[in-house]
Structures are given as C-alpha cells and as structure tokens.
Amino acid sequence: MKLNSFSPLPEDDEELHLPELVYWASLGDVEQVEQLLVEGIDPNQTDDEGYSALQAAAENDHLALVKLLVSKGANVAYKSEYTALQLAEMAEHAEVVAYLKSL
C-alpha cells in the first residue's frame, strides 16, 4: 500500500491496513495529520479493527495531536476495545490523561 510519494510504508505490504490518518497519528506527525484533515479526512477514521487516530495519538503520548484531533471533531467517547482515555491511562501518559479528563 502506498500512501503518498514520501511515505515510508512499503508499497506491497498486504498485511498493513492502517489508514493514513491513524498511521501518522501513531507516529506523532502533526504536519501530516493537519494536511489530511485539511484535505477532508474524517477525524474519526478507524483501521479495520476499529482503532482510531485519537486512540493512536493518546496511546503513544502525542498530546499535541490529541488536542488537534479533538479540536477537529474526533469523538473522545469512541470505544473499540478501549477509549483513548483508557489507552492513555494504561500507558501512563499523565498529560494526555489529564487533558482527556478535562473535556
């Protein structure tokens, strides 16, 4: 799967099913996430297993991305197996937890 011309993802990886937004959110790439949102990507987009960009950002301690996604309409209450808050709590990311609890 090729996401774009500068993507580090392999072109022929049939096992990788991450949408671009979830991928870049998991890496903490604010610039790429902002660009996708400007292009109209749904901030609540999920992968095949229901994992959202907000969950990816929260679980990986990317507070700036969590704030960005929330400001663009990401559903804080969304739950696949866990909510973004629960994932941040399990990973012990105190700032992300505090922010999500403040909403």
Question: PLM features: residue spans?
Answer:
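Intrinsically disordered, low-complexity regulatory segments in ankyrin-centric signaling systems
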Residues: 1-39
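Conserved ankyrin/ankyrin-like repeat signature
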Residues: 32, 64-65, 95-96
